[in-house]
Amino acid sequence: MRPLDAVELAEPEEVEVLEPEEDFEQFLLPVIHEMREDIASLTRERGRAPARNRGKLWEMDNMLIQIKTQVEASEESALNHLQGAGGAEPRGPRAEKADEKAQEMAKMAEMLVQLVRRIEKSESS
């Protein structure tokens, strides 16, 4: 570091001093408007987030209903196929395979229902 000269210490920088009204209009007013816009933007975003989450949950609920409907239709189709082929006959490997598939689909649907319930519970907390 170099030592300061006495001349440098004696001459302070000149700073333009504004009237309070000019200062307010030039510097504070734009900042206040910008802050208001930011607050309004954050408020709008905060309002949209729950709506988006509700939309996602509604979409997931519809998917679960479709899956459940498909599982029930598959089970019914498998049962109708077995009854049409003669329910008194011993069950063949195709019937057992159809039952296994129906059970797997039912398990998947139940797991999806549990997942949605956990998501709903975590979002409501």
UniProtKB/Swiss-Prot annotation:
Keywords: Coiled coil, Cytoplasm, Nucleus. Widely expressed in all tissues examined and as early as 7 days during embryonic development. GO terms for cellular component: nucleus; perinuclear region of cytoplasm. It is found in: Nucleus; Cytoplasm, Perinuclear region. It comes from the Eukaryota. Disruption phenotype: Male mice are viable, fertile and show normal T-cell function. InterPro entries: MRFAP1 (IPR029254). Residues 76-99 are annotated as: Disordered. Residues 94-124 form a coiled coil. Belongs to the MORF4 family-associated protein family. Found in a complex composed of MORF4L1, MRFAP1 and RB1. Interacts via its N-terminus with MORF4L1. Interacts with CSTB and MORF4L2. This is MORF4 family-associated protein 1. It comes from Mus musculus (Mouse). The lineage of its organism: Eukaryota, Metazoa, Chordata, Craniata, Vertebrata. The gene is Mrfap1.
